[in-house]
Structure formats: structure tokens, C-alpha cells
Design a protein with these regions (language model features):
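Bacterial N-terminal signal peptides
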Residues: 8-20
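N-terminal secretory signal peptides that target proteins for export/translocation
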Residues: 1-5
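Lipid interaction determinants
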Residues: 25-72, 76-412
């Protein structure tokens, strides 16, 4: 049986956006070929999947608390837009829940202003989604809205917020394939260069319900042409391929501009961040970044990186047990590495019983190479390469976010 959707809700979803005025002026963001505002009382877009972003509702009184505006994949337009929408209807559904969502309103071609578009509605009985595909400049774009939909009241609230926010938002979208200018202009030479690194202390709440302090690390790479990358650049310290970063929908890079005694970072998605000069370094977001030296190409490593963690539940929480884990990677000067990781969960040892589940993953290891400021891992058995930044900071050697226990030597 198809999930039920109120008739008024479906009628509203059939693109009232085509004639609805957009929201008031808001901060603009960019993701791939789409330029869009952040609606009032919605959070800035976030996402761990490189192909999508979500803007969570932040409406007063927890109204539609779990509602999200969704920005998904895009592709070259080919064939029927409604068929493309149907083929991608599970893009915003967790992999282990994809069989649970049933279509309540099949993909239907409906124009959105002068653009071809299609709409589909689906639900798993507790959550509902309305998906929209829009063709612009020869490309298909997938957008969506989801929220609670377990009963008539939840459906009504979700539908009302959709009508008030998502539908007007659709009318404000701009598309780079139609000639809309990027929010990130061409860079201007900025005079910065090299790798900068810093750390800060964060307070977090552990599974044992106790507050803990842990260090967070940050790296930012600058190039003289005015480009920066926040994190691990795909090409390391080699000159960045801005076109490839843009095409890959990467949002961790952008332009920097020196202004007076400070600096402004403008990310590819439109976010901005200010940095202030502090001695020889820069302070931003709680981090003080100082310039560090990348390891030279061909550096040989003799040592290891390791970690171990444990968390348990505090007395009085009604729970016992916890989780632990650890890992170690050993590097040899001849270019080999080997590693292992282990993890386990356990319960109620305090009462003398307990159980242990989980196990180890003894990695076969492989070869490593230092190039362009990166430590590149080439695993055995044809697995994909991965890389972390490798550099000297003060008297330590950092491999990604780990301190090396050992030594490095120059290439032979």
C-alpha cells in the first residue's frame, strides 16, 4: 500500500514555487553548479557525503525539528527528467533503510517557471520526503525536503513548513550552467605560501557522561596566486587544480585576501572566515596557525604512529560497559609499512560476567612514499591509495593528526 499524503499537501507540493516569491535577503551559498540562499531560521548547509548537503530547520519552539532542505547530486541532462528523478529517489536515504521508503506520489513532470522539473513524494511510515528534479542549462539537479511523517499531525506540520520555506526557496535558485556567476571569483595574488598548522583544546561529552578535553588539529595550505585549502589538498602542496576542485564539488578550498593586519578566507561554497595576525602566526576559529615544514620528497620514515582509546559509562547512568579501540602503523626506511587496528565493545564487567564482541583488522600493509608534502599509502591487494599531510612542527613530526614515534631521514 502506498503511504498516504494529505491532498492539500500534494497540491502545494506541485510547484506553487513557480509563482511564489522567494524569501527575504539571506546569505548565499554555492554547491557544485547550484547557487542558493540559506532560508531564515535554517542552519548553514552541512554534509559528510561529498555529493550532497543538508540545511536543518532551526525554527522556534522546535517546530518541524527534524525538517531538512536537501541538495543532492547533479548530472548532465539526458532522457526523461522524471525517470532520472525516480532513479535517484534514494539519494537522501541511508543505505540500510532504502527498502523501507515507498513512493506515495510517483515522479511527475511539472514545469517550474520556465524550467522542466519533476516531483516525487515518498515515505517509510515515520519520515517523508518530497524530491524535486530541475533541469537548468542542460543539467539535472536533485533537491529535496524531508521531515517527520508518522501521523496526520506530523504530516500536516511538515507539509506546512515545506510550503512556507522549501517551495519559495526553489524560486530563488541560480544555476551556473545558465550563466550565473560563481560566488568564488578568480583569485588575486596574495603573497602567502606553504603549509600552516595549529591546534586547540575542545571539551566534549563522552559516552561515560563525563566532560573530556581533547585536542583538535587544523592545517591550511596557501599558494601565492591567492588560493588556499583547508585540510588535506588532493595534490598536496603542488599547485592546485581549481577546475578539478570545482567540478568535484569540493568546498574546503577558496580564495584568501590580505586586509590590513588580517586576512579573509572565502570558501568555494560562499562561507567566509576572518583570521587575525598573532606574532608570526594567524588566529582563526580558536586555532593559532603557524608555518610548518613539509617533509621533503622521498623522506624515509623509521618509527610508528599509534593510538588507543577507552570510554565507559559513569556510575549512576544506569549503564555499564563501554568501548575501546586502538591501532598502530609501523614504517620502515625501505618504504614499507604495516599496520593493524583493533576494537571491542564490552558490558557489565563490574558484575563479573561480561561479554566481548568485535575483533581485529590486521592490515597487510603496503608501500609508502612522501611527495608534495603528502605521505601516500599504497596498500597491498590493489586497494585505493590514501594520503595525509606529513610535516615537521617544532621538534615533532606529524603524519596527519598523529605524532611520529621515531625518526625521519632524507632521501638517498
Amino acid at each position: 500500500m502506498r503511504p498516504r499524503f494529505p491532498a492539500a499537501f500534494i497540491a502545494a507540493a506541485l510547484f506553487a514555487a513557480a509563482v511564489t516569491a522567494g524569501p527575504a535577503a539571506a546569505e548565499m551559498r554555492q554547491f557544485g553548479g547550484l547557487i542558493f540562499p540559506v532560508p531564515p531560521q535554517f542552519d548553514d548547509p552541512v554534509g559528510t557525503d561529498p555529493s550532497q548537503r543538508a540545511m536543518w530547520s532551526n525554527l522556534p519552539d522546535d517546530r518541524c525539528e527534524y525538517c531538512r532542505i536537501l541538495i543532492g547530486p547533479e548530472a548532465k541532462a539526458s532522457g526523461s527528467i522524471s525517470r532520472w528523478l525516480d532513479q535517484n529517489r534514494e539519494a537522501f536515504v541511508d543505505e540500510d533503510e532504502r527498502g523501507d521508503f515507498k513512493v506515495g506520489k510517483p515522479a511527475t513532470n511539472t514545469p517550474l517557471g520556465k524550467r522542466d522539473a519533476a516531483m516525487l513524494a515518498q515515505s517509510d511510515g515515520s519520515d517523508m520526503q518530497v524530491l524535486v528534479a530541475i533541469e537548468a542549462g542542460g543539467r539535472f539537479h536533485l533537491l529535496g525536503f524531508d521531515g517527520d511523517g508518522g501521523d496526520e499531525d506530523e504530516l500536516a506540520e511538515t507539509g506546512a513548513v515545506l510550503t512556507e520555506t522549501f517551495l519559495p526557496w526553489l524560486a530563488t535558485l541560480r544555476f551556473r550552467a545558465e550563466g550565473a556567476p560563481s560566488l568564488l571569483p578568480e583569485p588575486v595574488a596574495g603573497g602567502m605560501e606553504g603549509l600552516w598548522w595549529g591546534w586547540r583544546s575542545d571539551v566534549t561529552l563522552g559516552t561515560d557522561m563525563m566532560m573530556k578535553t581533547q585536542n583538535s588539529y587544523r592545517t591550511v595550505t596557501f599558494w601565492p596566486d591567492g588560493t588556499f585549502y583547508d585540510g588535506t589538498p588532493p595534490l598536496g602542496l603542488a599547485p592546485p587544480d581549481r577546475a578539478a576542485l570545482d567540478a568535484g564539488r569540493d568546498t574546503d578550498w577558496g580564495n584568501y585576501v590580505r586586509q590590513g593586519g588580517g586576512m579573509v578566507l572565502t570558501y568555494a561554497d560562499g562561507r567566509t572566515e576572518k583570521a587575525a595576525r598573532e606574532g608570526d602566526g594567524w588566529t582563526t576559529g580558536g586555532f593559532t596557525l603557524n608555518r610548518v615544514e613539509p617533509l621533503p620528497d622521498g623522506t624515509r620514515i623509521d618509527g610508528r604512529i599509534s593510538w588507543i582509546s577507552f570510554s565507559g559509562f559513569a556510575p549512576g547512568t544506569g549503564m555499564t560497559g563501554g568501548a575501546g579501540g586502538g591501532g598502530e602503523t609501523v614504517f620502515h626506511p625501505d618504504g614499507r609499512y604495516e599496520g593493524s587496528s583493533f576494537g571491542t565493545a564490552f558490558g557489565s564487567f563490574a558484575e563479573g560476567g561480561g561479554f566481548s564482541v568485535g575483533g581485529g583488522d590486521d592490515a597487510a600493509g603496503g608501500r609508502y612514499e612522501v611527495r608534495d608534502g603528502l605521505l601516500v599509502f599504497a596498500p597491498q591487494k590493489g586497494k585505493a591509495e590514501r594520503a595525509v599531510l606529513a610535516f615537521s612542527a617544532d621538534d615533532s613530526v606529524m603524519l596527519g593528526t598523529d605524532f611520529l614515534e621515531g625518526s625521519v631521514s632524507p632521501p638517498r
